[in-house]
Design a protein with these regions (language model features):
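Mature catalytic core of soluble alpha/beta enzymes
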Residues: 5, 10, 14-44, 48-307
Length: 307
C-alpha cells in the first residue's frame, strides 16, 4: 500500500488551520493563541440519522441502485474511544467488517498501551525499527510540528502521563515536576532515517492527535475497494464521509458547543470530506474548583486556556 496516495484527513484539517494562523500571525505567541482558541472551541457530532430531511442536493446524482436497505452499520471501541462505521452497497457488510479489522490492526500498531507496538518499543528503548505506517505518521507529525512551531507535538506524551490523562489517575502536577518533564518535550528530539526511529533526551511519543485521522482515511480506502459510494465513519469525533447520502443530499455534521449539553455552534453539510475538531469538556477533571482538560499546551505543560 502506498500511504502517500491519500492525505490523512486529520493532517489536512490541522495544516489548514495552521496555514490560516501563519498567514495572519508571524509571531509564535499569536499563533499559539489562535490554535488554542480553535482547539478548545469545538467538538463534532454526526447528525446523519436525525436530520436527513434538510440536506441540500449536491452535484452527485441520487443513486438508483443503492438505498437504505443496503445499509450496514457497526460500532466498536478502539483507540480509547467509541467508533461508528456505516456503509451502503451490496458489499457494505464486507466493507465494514474488513474496515473494523483494519482499525484494530492500526490500534495495536500505534497504541502506547500495547507492549509490542512500534511506539511502545521506541518509548521504552529510545529507538526502534518501525513499520512503513509508523514511519509515515512520524514523518507527517514532524512536518506538522514544524508548520505549527511546536504547537502540535507528539512528544507531549510524558506531560499527558504526568497529568494522569493516559491512566485516568488525574492530578495537578507540582510545578517543579512539570518543568522537569517539559525538558523531554520537543519534536526536535525525534529523528527518523530509513525506518530507524530515534528518541533523544528521554523523549516519548504518542499518536493520539493524528492516528484517528490516518485510520479514517484507511477506512475510506477500504470502502472504495469494496465499491462503496456512500458511507460515513465517526472515530470519536473524527468524522469522515464518502460521497453523499443515498438520496443525494449531503451528510450533516453538527459542531457541538464547548459548554456541552445539546447546544451546537453550527451544522456543516459535507460530502467526501472530513470534519475533525477537539474539545476540552469530555476529557477533564476538577480539583479545588478548577477544571483541567486534556488539550495541553506543549510550551507551558498546562491545559490550553483561551482568552
Amino acid at each position: 500500500i502506498s500511504h502517500r496516495r491519500f492525505a490523512t484527513s486529520c493532517l489536512e484539517v490541522r495544516i489548514i488551520m495552521r496555514r490560516i494562523v501563519n498567514e495572519r500571525n508571524t509571531k509564535r505567541k499569536k499563533a499559539a493563541i489562535i490554535l488554542k482558541k480553535t482547539a478548545a472551541a469545538t467538538m463534532c457530532v454526526i447528525l446523519a440519522a436525525g436530520m436527513t430531511a434538510c440536506g441540500k442536493k449536491t452535484d452527485s446524482a441520487q443513486s438508483e441502485s443503492v438505498s437504505e436497505n443496503d445499509k450496514y452499520s457497526s460500532d466498536i471501541f478502539a483507540m480509547d474511544t467509541y467508533m461508528s462505521l456505516t456503509a451502503y452497497g451490496a458489499k457494505a457488510e464486507d466493507a465494514v467488517t474488513v474496515a473494523i479489522h483494519e482499525i484494530q490492526r492500526l490500534d495495536a500498531m500505534f497504541s502506547v498501551g500495547n507492549t509490542d507496538s512500534d511506539v511502545t518499543t521506541a518509548n521504552m528503548q529510545g529507538s526502534a525499527t518501525v513499520s512503513d505506517e509508523t514511519a509515515y505518521l512520524v514523518e507527517q507529525s514532524l512536518e506538522i510540528s514544524r508548520k505549527t512551531d511546536g504547537a502540535f507535538d507528539i512528544t507531549i506524551y510524558p506531560v499527558m502521563e504526568l497529568w494522569g490523562f493516559t491512566t485516568k489517575n488525574y492530578k495537578v502536577p507540582q510545578a517543579d515536576e512539570l518543568q522537569e518533564t517539559l525538558k523531554r518535550v520537543s519534536y526536535e528530539n525525534v529523528s527518523l532515517k530509513d525506518h530507524e526511529l530515534v528518541l533523544k533526551n528521554n523523549a516519548q511519543i504518542d499518536f493520539g492527535g493524528i492516528a484517528k485521522g490516518y485510520t479514517s482515511s484507511r477506512v475510506m480506502q477500504i470502502f472504495k475497494e469494496y465499491g462503496i459510494e456512500h458511507g460515513m465513519v465517526n472515530l470519536g469525533g473524527n468524522v469522515q464521509t464518502l460521497g453523499t447520502k443515498t438520496d443525494g443530499t449531503a451528510w450533516r455534521v453538527a459542531i457541538q458547543s464547548p459548554q456541552g449539553g445539546n447546544q451546537y455552534l453550527g451544522i456543516l453539510e459535507t460530502s467526501d470530506q472530513a470534519v475533525i475538531t477537539s474539545g476540552g469538556y469530555e476529557r477533564y477533571f476538577e480539583e479545588n474548583g478548577v477544571t483541567y482538560h486534556h488539550i495541553i499546551d506543549p510550551k507551558t505543560g498546562y491545559p490550553s486556556d483561551s482568552d
